[in-house]
């Protein structure tokens, strides 16, 4: 069974068709890239999948169930995680406390700041930090982290909910080449360990063709290519429209 099934999704803003009849599926464990220039509809498509937007036509199925009635929070609890181009963390809390809060939220429970001093989730939070290579920064304020480490922290926050599907919006934006490859190697390793599917947007073609097992290409809201990286790289329309663009 497909983990994610997107069927003929449509979403317009005024007269602009941001997502225009997009259909595709993802299997558990797949690592796929969604590419296209700014304005192609990538973020809108992610917002339709995670519940921040409602489609005007079409539907999204997750593990065979329609997501129509699910809020964004419910989709997170059911196994759809997301990271953003601009990392969303609590800057004034420690790295460990950030993950403790994420673990509590995954359980549908609120924590006060005082609770973090004794909360039993500290051990689980430490384990997540070890998975993303941040255990040595556990007691540091999130605001003190280097940019690449902030992206790792956001990944740990997303993993706290044990997602079966992780949507990643430009995970390596702003990183040097070595940082990009290190982060993507970590993501692929973590996905393989849990059979988690990953769908990521990315402008760096070295990342796309170095790590995606499948590439989907959007143009003006339409899916114009979908296949293994070698086939997409050889597609003449994709070459003409996108592969020379890095912004």
Residue spans for each PLM region:
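Glycine-rich phosphate-binding loops of nucleotide-dependent enzymes
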Residues: 2-247
């Amino acid at each position: 069974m497909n983990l994610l099934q997107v069927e003929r999704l449509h979403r317009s803003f005024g007269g602009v068709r941001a997502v225009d009849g997009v259909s595709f599926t993802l299997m558990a464990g797949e690592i796929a890239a969604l590419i296209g220039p700014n304005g192609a509809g990538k973020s809108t498509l992610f917002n339709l999948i995670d519940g921040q937007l409602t489609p005007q036509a079409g539907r999204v199925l997750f593990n065979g169930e329609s997501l129509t009635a699910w809020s964004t929070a419910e989709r997170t609890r059911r196994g759809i995680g997301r990271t953003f181009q601009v990392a969303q963390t609590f800057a004034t809390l420690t790295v460990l406390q950030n993950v403790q809060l994420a673990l509590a939220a995954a359980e549908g429970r609120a924590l006060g700041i005082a609770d973090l001093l004794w909360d039993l989730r500290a051990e689980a939070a430490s384990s997540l930090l070890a998975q993303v290579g941040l255990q040595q920064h556990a007691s540091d304020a999130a605001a003190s982290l280097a940019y690449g480490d902030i992206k790792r922290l956001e990944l740990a926050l997303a993993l706290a909910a044990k997602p079966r599907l992780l949507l990643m919006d430009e995970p390596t934006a702003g990183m040097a080449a070595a940082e990009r490859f290190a982060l993507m190697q970590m993501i692929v390793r973590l996905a393989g360990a849990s059979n988690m599917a990953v769908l990521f947007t990315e402008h760096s073609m070295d990342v796309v063709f170095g790590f995606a097992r499948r590439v989907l290409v959007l143009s003006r809201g339409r899916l114009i290519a979908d296949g293994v990286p070698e086939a997409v790289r050889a597609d003449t329309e994709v070459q003409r429209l996108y592969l020379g663009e890095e912004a």
